[in-house]
Amino acid sequence: MKAIVVKPPNPGVEIKDVKDDENKLSNIGLVKVKILENGICGTDREIVSGKRTSVKPPIGKDELILGHEAIGIVEVGGYGFKEGELVMPINKRGCGKCLNCLIGRPDFCETGEGLVAGTKGLDGFMREYLYDDPKYLVKIPPAIKDIAILAQPLADIEKSVESILTSQKRIPIWTCDDGTLNCRKALVVGTGPTGILFSLVLRTYGFQVWIANRRELLDNEKEILDEPRILFYNSAKGYESLVKDVDKFDLIIDTTGASASIIQELVPLLQINGVLGLFGFPRYDNFSLDYKIVQDFVINNRIIIGLDNGQKPHFQQALIHLASWKSLWPKTASKMITKIISINDEREVISSLREKLPGEIKVKIVWE
């Protein structure tokens, strides 16, 4: 079968024929899925460029099938799945040892030995066919097939927001005087795909949301943010004027994955009882906090929390939110898929795996 393959840690990518795993169907409990489309994300590009040093092929192999975002159609079903149903595979798999993994929550793996499709020890989904355990498959409603590929990155954000709201249960009451979160203010740093998805989820929960970047918004970004009333702030000159206008924030999310020093810029912007969520992976620099800021952190019950992968419940929640956005913000939903490429256009596929388009939210590779 055809697949998109890398040889980590070396840079480069190719589309080639690989051995089909159809003999796996002789193993009781697997479902055969024909892949219809894949999403491309920043992780894929880091692997292709050779910058993601933690990437590991499956044991005994020197090649890795790329990709952790996919939608497919069931060809050989069973175990609760019917032929013709649309499904999405879950990318993170358990270590088989710790309790969290054994109960279906490898996002909290305690051994560090879990597998990640297309990244760590497990072939990914950029291939014609997949033979998978049904517990790692999520059913996709046909009505949202056009944007359902976003459910994988969105699942990570659903888990992140869940973690934040759970952490705020430490406070007797964090809702507003009308029982909602409408009075709570959130700042999302970064207007890339992750930042935009975070902003949309937070608006869905009722937060007032500001999104920041050190450049002006591109036209398509403006169109996406306008309908849900997400406010933009240009942070090129710092955040002083923003705090002056709107006061401090109950929640701040860093999605930039750039300089670690941004953390010390954001900490002073937190409201009492506030949360700073770190989602992006800083690539350089360092940060330090003055002892007075640390004291202030303790006295005012502020926290910093690391945010990571979602699991099956979060994929299901992501699909619910995607369906709701098509009704709540139809114009926004229609702008989320930036480009669609055929797997037969090899040159364009390789180019898209190497470079991100300006203002890109999601590029899809289709296999039909």
UniProtKB/Swiss-Prot annotation:
Zn(2+) 2 binds at C95, C98, C101, C109. Catalyzes the NAD(P)(+)-dependent oxidation of D-glucose to D-gluconate via gluconolactone. Can utilize both NAD(+) and NADP(+) as electron acceptor. Is involved in the degradation of glucose through a non-phosphorylative variant of the Entner-Doudoroff pathway. Binds 2 Zn(2+) ions per subunit. One of the zinc atoms is essential for catalytic activity while the other has a structural function. Substrate binds at T43, N91, Q152, D156, N309. InterPro entries: ADH-like_N (IPR013154), Glc_1-DH_arc (IPR026583), Glu_dehyd_C (IPR031640), GroES-like_sf (IPR011032), NAD(P)-bd_dom_sf (IPR036291), Zn_alcohol_dh (IPR050129). Its cofactor is Zn(2+). Zn(2+) 1 binds at C41, H68, E69, Q152. The lineage of its organism: Archaea, Thermoproteota, Thermoprotei, Sulfolobales, Sulfolobaceae. It comes from the Archaea. This is Glucose 1-dehydrogenase 2. GO terms for biological process: non-phosphorylated glucose catabolic process; protein tetramerization.
